[in-house]
Amino acid sequence: MKGQLPHLVGEHLLKVANVRPGTAEAHALTYLDFDQAAKRYGKVGGFAHLATLVKRMKASRPGALLLDGGDTWQGSGTALWTNGQDMVDACKLLGVDVMTGHWEFTLGMERVKEIIEKDFKGKVDFVAQNVKTQDFGDPVFKPYVIREINGVPCAIIGQAFPYTPIAN
């Protein structure tokens, strides 16, 4: 198969990606048989586990960046109760370098801007080239950042959820 997989989930993803059901890969890539796989493979995930992996990756690959594609600041009870602050703090502790938004915009544009200006300033770049003001279509956020990785300049372009204006 050439190129990238189309948006597929569950059994369809496993079939197209040629991944056997019941394997560790199937557990990592799908929601299928989650209870059974959780019993077999034990606890996975969580920010403590993620922090360990990020530290290992950055130690073994100097110049590596941690990118966040969104869906991070919302979705849990604690995120709801703290208006996303618990997850924002976790992102900073993990060492996220560059982020774009998805469901973060459900917090409201003012809250998102507040986080970027207060919590992320000088620490995390927030990029979203496709989020524009409704009146004149001006960019709301930086569209991209240039980061040098092992001497090579690389552009990281932010592509937020394209239906943000009507979904949130």
Where are these regions (language model features)?
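Acidic, metal/ion-coordinating pockets
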Residues: 1-168
